[in-house]
């Protein structure tokens, strides 16, 4: 099993393996098998289109967690320039599960903030698997208030399984930190554009997700609990995660139907991990368009629009 492919992608993985084997045979024997390789590559593209045209919520959830999916720092590298990271909450520590700082987006100064997961074991531990502690949310809020002070729009990138549930985090006021962020973000006098680039896990996502426009990547998810967690509660078994994912309506398409998501950003065929650069440029285009829409409003119009947006949830 190719670990770069998810379980539902194994038919694609098998075709890819055949293509690689043919390439090796051709190289070793100087045979011209390019026509057969081209035929298999066309078949692979057709199969990928077929599989990805009818994905269920559980398959989307797996894609949202793909280990090679671009993370916040990848987007900062490809989308922004002159990024200057800012550290610490000025109270306790610097939470590396949240990254943020001043950058330029197409020449315009912005404050960019996002969750950051890790790829290798050491980085995963350093980033706490993308699960922020209270100091991470307080750092994010400090950066947002700085952005407001200097009239810079805020761009947030959401990708977390949720806020860290450890005892230390609870003792330092995890719920208070999240709630305070929600309250302050609702009245910041600067545009806020948020994008779910992977997992949007409950309050851990909302704490940097109160915004004027919410976008989601095509294979992102947003939910109050993971499918496995929901299945464990309802059916006492994580094996029914697929049923839970479908019932919760966690996909971008379903959330747009419910009026929660404004824009769905299409991903490359096969998912965002197939081409970080292509995905980043699509994200950049959509963020710039959203900023143009929000910066055309007066401060009073912006705040009224944000308030009405928040009050409309659940109606």
Curated annotation (Swiss-Prot):
Pfam name, any one: ACCA
Annotated transmembrane regions: none
UniProt keyword list: ATP-binding, Cytoplasm, Fatty acid biosynthesis, Fatty acid metabolism, Lipid biosynthesis, Lipid metabolism, Nucleotide-binding, Transferase
Chief location category: cytoplasm
GO annotation (BP), single: fatty acid biosynthetic process
Reaction catalysis annotation: N(6)-carboxybiotinyl-L-lysyl-[protein] + acetyl-CoA = N(6)-biotinyl-L-lysyl-[protein] + malonyl-CoA
Enzyme Commission designation: 2.1.3.15
GO cellular component, as recorded: acetyl-CoA carboxylase complex
Domain spans labelled CoA carboxyltransferase C-terminal: 40-293
UniProt subcellular location: Cytoplasm
Gene Ontology molecular function, alphabetical: acetyl-CoA carboxylase activity; ATP binding; carboxyl- or carbamoyltransferase activity
Biochemical pathway: Lipid metabolism; malonyl-CoA biosynthesis; malonyl-CoA from acetyl-CoA: step 1/1
Main function: Component of the acetyl coenzyme A carboxylase (ACC) complex. First, biotin carboxylase catalyzes the carboxylation of biotin on its carrier protein (BCCP) and then the CO(2) group is transferred by the carboxyltransferase to acetyl-CoA to form malonyl-CoA.
Similarity section: Belongs to the AccA family.
Subunit structure comment from the entry: Acetyl-CoA carboxylase is a heterohexamer composed of biotin carboxyl carrier protein (AccB), biotin carboxylase (AccC) and two subunits each of ACCase subunit alpha (AccA) and ACCase subunit beta (AccD).
Stated name of the protein: Acetyl-coenzyme A carboxylase carboxyl transferase subunit alpha
């Amino acid at each position: 099993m190719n670990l770069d492919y998810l379980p539902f992608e194994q038919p694609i993985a098998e075709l890819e393996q055949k293509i690689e084997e043919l390439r090796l045979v051709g190289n070793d024997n100087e045979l011209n098998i390019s026509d057969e390789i081209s035929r298999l590559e066309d078949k692979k593209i057709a199969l990928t289109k077929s599989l990805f045209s009818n994905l269920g919520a559980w398959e989307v959830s797996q894609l949202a967690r793909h280990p090679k999916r671009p993370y916040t720092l990848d987007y900062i590298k490809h989308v922004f320039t002159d990024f200057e990271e800012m550290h610490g909450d000025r109270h306790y520590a610097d939470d590396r599960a949240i990254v943020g700082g001043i950058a330029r987006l197409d020449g315009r100064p912005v404050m960019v903030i996002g969750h950051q997961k890790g790829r290798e074991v050491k980085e995963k531990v350093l980033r706490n698997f993308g699960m922020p502690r209270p100091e991470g949310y307080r750092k994010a809020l400090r950066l947002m208030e700085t952005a407001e002070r200097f009239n810079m729009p805020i761009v947030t990138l959401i990708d977390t399984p949720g806020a860290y549930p450890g005892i230390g985090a609870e003792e330092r006021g995890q719920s208070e930190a999240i709630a305070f962020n929600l309250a302050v973000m609702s009245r910041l006098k600067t545009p806020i554009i948020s994008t779910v680039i992977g997992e949007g896990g409950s309050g851990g996502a909302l704490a940097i997700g109160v915004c004027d426009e919410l976008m989601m990547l095509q294979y992102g998810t947003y939910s109050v609990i993971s499918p496995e967690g929901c299945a464990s509660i309802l059916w006492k078994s994580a094996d029914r995660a697929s049923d839970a994912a479908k019932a919760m309506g966690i996909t971008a398409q379903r959330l747009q139907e419910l009026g929660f998501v404004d824009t769905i950003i299409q991903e490359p065929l096969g998912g965002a991990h197939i081409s970080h650069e292509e995905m980043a440029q699509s994200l950049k285009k959509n963020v710039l368009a959203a900023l143009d829409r929000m910066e055309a409003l007066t401060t009073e119009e912006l705040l009224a629009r944000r308030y009405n947006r928040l009050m409309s949830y659940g109606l």
